[in-house]
Swiss-Prot record:
Cellular compartment(s): Cytoplasm
Region (Disordered) location: 1-39
Catalytic activity, EC: 2.8.4.3
Any matching Pfam family: UPF0004
Catalysed reactions, as listed in the record: N(6)-dimethylallyladenosine(37) in tRNA + (sulfur carrier)-SH + AH2 + 2 S-adenosyl-L-methionine = 2-methylsulfanyl-N(6)-dimethylallyladenosine(37) in tRNA + (sulfur carrier)-H + 5'-deoxyadenosine + L-methionine + A + S-adenosyl-L-homocysteine + 2 H(+)
Domain MTTase N-terminal: 47-162
Name of the protein in its database record: tRNA-2-methylthio-N(6)-dimethylallyladenosine synthase
One example of a Gene Ontology biological process annotation: tRNA methylthiolation
Residue ranges of every copy of the TRAM domain listed in the record: 416-479
């Protein structure tokens, strides 16, 4: 990548409120290798940077934002940490497992620092927490940036001391990064932070209160993405349904999320998706906007977390089973062919077998196409960690396996209904087997097809689905006449299997 790119100048808008700040503590000078005086003076040459991302799509967007800053400063982005002068790790703190991965990675990087000149940085949600700051001290991290201080990356690397940036800064919300290069898909952040306080969730602590981006900035960034060839955009926020209502106040000049969807859908973009939704703020108008706007994909991810009212109260989710099912009915009314996904936390403190059966029965009542399913992970700093006693891991794991089996059954049934249909599929590029292409439908179904004459690369195609498993669909690209295009290799679904476990069932 190595090309220089100019960062988009921010547009300023009157802010309805100012985010709180944290003062970074003074830190000792670097014990081994001082930071370069500038990005252009690392070992007398252009700095080489490598970025590693854990966690959600918001983190992927933030990594792209910081990477674009580094490129605009003159840094080269390299493919391997072994080639890099600067390694920056974007972290996740939602569950314990990604935190353990960060510890392991930082341990390896600390060993490398003992052998060569290397600057190590840590950003993202974990960096904002005391837990992450203790990890940073232990593993001699040089640069620490919270989610609200990402634009401090230049100042951090020009510092001759360890640099901690943990403030929530308004200018981050107005900054527009350049679009991704050569990609058909892009993320677009419409807001940051969250005003809900679910008892298990650390996000309000790590990302601060909700701040909606001005619609003009959103549409400007979308225009840049369209000009760069993007054909599918995913709108990102911790709670997109609350867009334009920050800390309980409706913002003047900001549309509702339903109207923002209509605006984005009318921009010329081919496909629009969004995540994440909170049922408390979901409205029927959002379902109506999806149903009436062709560009908005008929895919709705509406996390329920539990089918038990008692557990939902302990989670402080602010809705009950009946209200959630009302939203599902509204969605199915306006989007008859909707593809539904959800999130489930299994084994929340105090969950009984009866509570878990309520979750299983909700599955049968809704009929989810896919789900992200996790056992409860206690996170320091959350109310559930402080006040509730965790369930035995063996019990949580056993319930998770039962839930996975239930979801697998539903996924198999739902995917089987797609066999013989024609789906619009965005193909990103080569699958695990180079003779095949992989991508996803408008309903987010992972799909694999053989390369065809005249269709052997990334693009948006009509695909006839010929075979489906609970995890994957297989098909053939159709030509303008509706007939399958001639294949390049012989179609072998087993050879096209995508490597690695899929996150959704």
């Amino acid at each position: 990548m190595g090309q220089k790119a100019k960062a988009q100048a921010p547009t300023t808008h009157p802010r309805p409120h100012t985010l709180s700040s944290q003062v970074a503590p003074a830190l000792p000078r670097r014990p081994r290798h001082a930071a370069p005086e500038s990005l252009r003076q690392a070992r007398g040459e252009v700095m080489k940077a490598h970025l590693i991302t854990y966690g959600c799509q918001m983190n992927e967007y933030d990594t792209h934002l910081v990477q674009s800053q580094l490129v605009s400063f003159g840094a080269d982005i390299v493919e391997s940490p072994d080639e890099a002068d600067f390694v920056l790790v974007n972290t996740c703190a939602v569950r314990g497992k990604p935190v353990d991965k960060v510890r392991s990675l930082l341990g390896d990087l600390r060993k490398q620092k003992a052998q060569r000149s290397l600057v190590v940085g840590m950003m993202g949600c974990l960096a904002q927490l005391e837990e992450g700051q203790q990890i940073a001290r232990k593993f001699e991290v040089d640069v620490l940036l919270g989610p609200g201080s990402l634009l401090d990356i230049g100042a951090a690397l020009e510092s001759n001391e360890r640099f901690w940036g943990l403030q929530f800064k308004d200018e981050l919300h107005d900054h527009i990064p350049p679009p991704p290069s050569g990609k058909l898909q892009a993320h677009l952040t419409i807001m940051r932070g969250c005003d809900h306080h679910c008892t298990y969730c650390i996000v309000p602590t790590t990302r601060g209160p909700q701040v909606s981006r001005h619609p003009d900035d959103i549409l400007r960034e979308l225009d840049m993405q369209l000009a760069a060839g993007v054909r599918e955009v995913t709108l990102l926020g911790q709670n997109v349904n609350a867009y334009g209502v920050d800390q309980g106040a409706k913002l003047k000049g900001y549309p509702s999320f339903a109207d923002l969807l209509r605006m984005v859908g009318a921009s010329g973009i081919e496909r629009v998706k969004f995540t994440t939704s909170h049922p408390m703020n979901f409205t029927e108008d959002v379902a109506a906007a999806i149903g009436e706007t062709p560009a908005i994909c008929e895919f709705v991810h509406l996390p329920v977390q539990s089918g038990s009212d008692r557990v939902l109260r302990r989670m402080a989710r602010e809705y009950n089973r009946e209200k959630y099912l009302t939203h599902i009915a509204q969605i199915k009314k306006h989007i008859p062919d909707v593809v539904l996904a959800t999130d489930i936390i299994v084994g929340f403190p105090g969950e009984t077998e009866e509570d878990f059966q309520d979750t299983l029965s909700l599955y049968d009542e809704v009929g989810y196409d896919s789900a992200y399913m996790f056992i409860y992970s206690p996170r320091p700093g959350t109310p559930s960690y402080k006040h509730f006693q965790d369930l035995p891991r063996e019990l949580k794991t056993e319930r998770l396996q039962r839930l996975i089996a239930r979801q697998k059954d539903w996924s198999a049934r739902k995917n089987a209904q797609k066999v013989g249909t024609v789906q619009q599929v965005l193909l990103r590029g080569d699958a695990h087997d180079a003779g095949f292409l992989e991508g996803h439908t408008r309903g987010n179904h992972p799909t694999v097809v053989p390369k065809a004459i005249g269709a052997d690369g990334a693009g948006v195609y009509q695909v006839r689905i010929d075979h489906a498993t609970p995890h994957m669909m297989y098909g053939h690209i159709l030509g303008p006449d509706g007939q399958p295009l001639p294949e390049q290799p012989r179609f072998n679904p087993e050879a096209a299997a995508v490597g690695g476990a899929l996150p959704m069932l």
